[in-house]
């Protein structure tokens, strides 16, 4: 009985020691958001807070062609990322900003600041987000 109890204690201690080893390093995680400086070939202008969400290369082919599509394929991994295309017309001074909130997975809130000039200009912004990131444009 004493030998069985001693063996059980050693087995428990061994499991405890092996369980406290350093964990394997996590896989490298890319940035939550990346600005992509590629202009879509086929732009559908809408409101600033209704971006087009591209989740696959097939979706991207509807908005990008030729060199723009090749550049997008080189910069974005559609297996791990999505693409947001914001396109609207407004004042030349309109600004689109974003804030990355510290949580896991991260949350990104896009905000719009209207310009003060009365000129009508096209605005196009393309962002690549990790697919596990939650995002919202405007609102709360």
Where are these regions (language model features)?
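Positively charged n-region of N-terminal signal peptides that target proteins for export
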Residues: 1-4
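Bacterial N-terminal signal peptides
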Residues: 7-16
């Amino acid at each position: 009985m004493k030998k069985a109890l001693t063996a059980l204690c050693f087995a428990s201690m061994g499991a405890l020691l092996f369980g406290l080893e350093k964990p394997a390093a996590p896989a490298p995680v890319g940035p939550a958001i990346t600005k992509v400086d590629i202009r879509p070939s086929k732009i559908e202008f809408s409101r600033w807070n209704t971006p087009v969400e591209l989740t696959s290369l097939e979706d991207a082919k509807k908005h990008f062609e030729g060199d723009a599509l090749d550049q997008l394929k080189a910069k974005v991994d559609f297996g791990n990322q999505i693409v947001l295309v914001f396109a609207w017309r407004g004042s030349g001074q309109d600004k689109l900003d974003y804030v990355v909130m510290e949580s896991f997975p991260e949350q990104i809130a896009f905000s719009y600041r209207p310009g003060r000039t009365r000129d009508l200009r096209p605005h196009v912004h393309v962002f690549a987000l990790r697919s596990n990131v939650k995002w919202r444009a405007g609102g709360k």
